[in-house]
């Protein structure tokens, strides 16, 4: 995923190439297109057509090509399993333990619950997280927190996610972190979200609470930065 995010961050630079030599530009485009076609035929899993993914996401075809190259570089087979996903994700958080949060994040990406994440799964989630509406991002976050996928978030699920995030950030990010800080954080947020006090947070309660409380929204945006 490191290569994927790296290539994505450089998209704007690549898109601003000077167009002084049209013939050279056309040659480069045709060469890249041939390379893309060859790449598509050499992997074990061939993703959906880029036109279809372009229609389903907020990325252009060219951006999808760049993202695909990065994904294939990290995952030559065209899919990534949980163990590989954890190894890649751990590289971004060397001072903490990212394994538990990576497990939850992997399950959120693996929408079909097959035990592997395809390029389509990855780019669809990335599209929501980077360019989705506030509503789309909140729905995706709710699904992440709903660990057992029963349509609700209970306090222990929220606690598991928040603690995993604190563990991942490590001691250098939180030098004076007390052991009960995650629990206190969850207690405050859950009390605000569980509006009818039935011990669970529904999607509607989650959406309403997040959009009406700036503190919750800021915290979620902070947590989304580690996705």
From Swiss-Prot:
<feature type="binding site">
    <location>
        <position position="198"/>
    </location>
    <ligand>
        <name>Ca(2+) 2</name>
    </ligand>
</feature>
<dbReference type="GO" id="GO:0005737">
    <property type="term" value="C:cytoplasm"/>
</dbReference>
<keyword id="KW-1003">Cell membrane</keyword>
<keyword id="KW-0633">Potassium transport</keyword>
<keyword id="KW-0106">Calcium</keyword>
<dbReference type="GO" id="GO:0008076">
    <property type="term" value="C:voltage-gated potassium channel complex"/>
</dbReference>
<dbReference type="GO" id="GO:0034705">
    <property type="term" value="C:potassium channel complex"/>
</dbReference>
<protein>
    <recommendedName>
        <fullName>A-type potassium channel modulatory protein KCNIP1</fullName>
    </recommendedName>
</protein>
<dbReference type="InterPro" id="IPR011992">
    <property type="entry name" value="EF-hand-dom_pair"/>
</dbReference>
<dbReference type="GO" id="GO:0071196">
    <property type="term" value="C:Kv4.3-KChIP1 channel complex"/>
</dbReference>
<feature type="binding site">
    <location>
        <position position="205"/>
    </location>
    <ligand>
        <name>Ca(2+) 2</name>
    </ligand>
</feature>
<feature type="binding site">
    <location>
        <position position="146"/>
    </location>
    <ligand>
        <name>Ca(2+) 1</name>
    </ligand>
</feature>
<keyword id="KW-0813">Transport</keyword>
<keyword id="KW-0472">Membrane</keyword>
<feature type="domain" description="EF-hand 4">
    <location>
        <begin position="181"/>
        <end position="216"/>
    </location>
</feature>
<dbReference type="InterPro" id="IPR002048">
    <property type="entry name" value="EF_hand_dom"/>
</dbReference>
<keyword id="KW-0631">Potassium channel</keyword>
<feature type="region of interest" description="Interaction with KCND2">
    <location>
        <begin position="214"/>
        <end position="227"/>
    </location>
</feature>
<dbReference type="GO" id="GO:0043025">
    <property type="term" value="C:neuronal cell body"/>
</dbReference>
<keyword id="KW-0406">Ion transport</keyword>
<dbReference type="GO" id="GO:0015459">
    <property type="term" value="F:potassium channel regulator activity"/>
</dbReference>
<keyword id="KW-0963">Cytoplasm</keyword>
<dbReference type="InterPro" id="IPR018247">
    <property type="entry name" value="EF_Hand_1_Ca_BS"/>
</dbReference>
<comment type="function">
    <text>Regulatory subunit of Kv4/D (Shal)-type voltage-gated rapidly inactivating A-type potassium channels. Regulates channel density, inactivation kinetics and rate of recovery from inactivation in a calcium-dependent and isoform-specific manner. Modulates KCND2/Kv4.2 currents. In vitro, modulates KCND1/Kv4.1 currents. Increases the presence of KCND2 at the cell surface.</text>
</comment>
<feature type="binding site">
    <location>
        <position position="196"/>
    </location>
    <ligand>
        <name>Ca(2+) 2</name>
    </ligand>
</feature>
<dbReference type="GO" id="GO:0009898">
    <property type="term" value="C:cytoplasmic side of plasma membrane"/>
</dbReference>
<keyword id="KW-0630">Potassium</keyword>
<feature type="domain" description="EF-hand 1; degenerate">
    <location>
        <begin position="38"/>
        <end position="94"/>
    </location>
</feature>
<keyword id="KW-0677">Repeat</keyword>
<feature type="domain" description="EF-hand 3">
    <location>
        <begin position="133"/>
        <end position="168"/>
    </location>
</feature>
<feature type="domain" description="EF-hand 2">
    <location>
        <begin position="97"/>
        <end position="132"/>
    </location>
</feature>
<dbReference type="Pfam" id="PF13833">
    <property type="entry name" value="EF-hand_8"/>
</dbReference>
<dbReference type="Pfam" id="PF13499">
    <property type="entry name" value="EF-hand_7"/>
</dbReference>
<dbReference type="GO" id="GO:0030425">
    <property type="term" value="C:dendrite"/>
</dbReference>
<keyword id="KW-0966">Cell projection</keyword>
<dbReference type="GO" id="GO:0005267">
    <property type="term" value="F:potassium channel activity"/>
</dbReference>
<dbReference type="GO" id="GO:0005509">
    <property type="term" value="F:calcium ion binding"/>
</dbReference>
<keyword id="KW-0407">Ion channel</keyword>
<dbReference type="InterPro" id="IPR028846">
    <property type="entry name" value="Recoverin"/>
</dbReference>
<dbReference type="GO" id="GO:0009966">
    <property type="term" value="P:regulation of signal transduction"/>
</dbReference>
<feature type="binding site">
    <location>
        <position position="152"/>
    </location>
    <ligand>
        <name>Ca(2+) 1</name>
    </ligand>
</feature>
<feature type="binding site">
    <location>
        <position position="194"/>
    </location>
    <ligand>
        <name>Ca(2+) 2</name>
    </ligand>
</feature>
């Amino acid at each position: 995923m490191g290569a994927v995010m790296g290539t994505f961050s450089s998209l704007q630079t690549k898109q601003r190439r000077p167009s002084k030599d049209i013939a050279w530009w056309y040659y480069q485009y045709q060469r890249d297109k041939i390379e893309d076609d060859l790449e598509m035929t050499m992997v074990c899993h061939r993703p959906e057509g880029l036109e279809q993914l372009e229609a389903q996401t907020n990325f252009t075809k060219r951006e999808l090509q760049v993202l695909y190259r990065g994904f294939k570089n990290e995952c030559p087979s065209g899919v990534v399993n949980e163990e590989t996903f954890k190894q890649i994700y751990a590289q971004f958080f060397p001072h903490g333990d990212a394994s538990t949060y990576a497990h939850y994040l992997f399950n959120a990406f693996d929408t079909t619950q097959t035990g592997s994440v395809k390029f389509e799964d990855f780019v669809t989630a990335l599209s929501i997280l980077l360019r989705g509406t506030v509503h789309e991002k909140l729905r995706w976050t709710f699904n992440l927190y709903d660990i057992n996928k029963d349509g609700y978030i209970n306090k222990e699920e929220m606690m598991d996610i928040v603690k995993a995030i604190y563990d991942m950030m490590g001691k250098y990010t939180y030098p004076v972190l007390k052991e009960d800080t995650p629990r206190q954080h969850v207690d405050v947020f859950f009390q605000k979200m569980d509006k009818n006090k039935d011990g669970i947070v529904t999607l509607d309660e989650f959406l309403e609470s997040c959009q009406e409380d700036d503190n919750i929204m800021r915290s979620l945006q902070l947590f989304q930065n580690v996705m």
